């Protein structure tokens, strides 16, 4: 009898469990945040969380192509366009950090005292090796917008090199080339931790109001994609934006430094 009850219970649990497919960015993956959230979510929901980490552009395309139930991304303009086209629903801001410019420590003195615009002009005028993601990610979109504000993206210049890689891999390329790169702070802290607190690339510009980096979750629209698990995607969005989970994200640190910020402004994007 006990065996029958155990088998029935196992079958019931199996039937209720689901696999939630998420498309997300390399920055949420590289920082280790998702690895930390995964066991918490799986324990509370009984589901399995699986994700593919790509640039935001590719993540949104996965949603458009019905290959993900939920998206965790960070390019507000692209996200809103995605929503406008009817590919996503329930877009909810979660957290933010900021973008920073980092450079080989031998170049740091060149940037001293310069604001964001002056730092970009320095890179351009002195032809400092600059590594661009070049992958339509949230970081790539932000970087391109900064160059456009300065007159145009210098794609044809030899000093401007596109990696086509994720954030952490692109940082390592910038390190190898003793160059400059725009990154989100969370991934930089992860890189810094990997280098045991002694990174070759250091922060040379930060703090400009335009460099806020907002992350949101979006459910793939079930009216557009009949195959997606909207029920569990919706529950995940409520879970990740609950006070309990947001407090966990706010307390998530490396080198005793928070990687993401939670506050009221985040929730109003």
Swiss-Prot record:
Localization in the cell: Periplasm
Any GO molecular function: ABC-type tungstate transporter activity
GO cellular component: periplasmic space
Pfam hit, one: PBP_like_2
Swiss-Prot/TrEMBL keywords: Periplasm, Signal, Tungsten
Knockout mutant characteristics: Mutants contain the same concentration of molybdenum but they show a 75% reduction in tungsten concentration and a 50% reduction in formate dehydrogenase (FDH) activity.
Cited InterPro entries: ABC-Tungstate_binding, PBP_domain, TupA
Leader sequence segment: 1-17
Other facts: Binds tungstate 50'000-fold more tightly than molybdate.
Subunit structure: The complex is composed of two ATP-binding proteins (TupC), two transmembrane proteins (TupB) and a solute-binding protein (TupA).
General function of this protein: Part of an ABC transporter complex involved in ultra-high affinity tungstate uptake. Specifically binds tungstate.
Protein name: Tungstate-binding protein TupA
Organism, scientific name: Campylobacter jejuni subsp. jejuni serotype O:2 (strain ATCC 700819 / NCTC 11168)
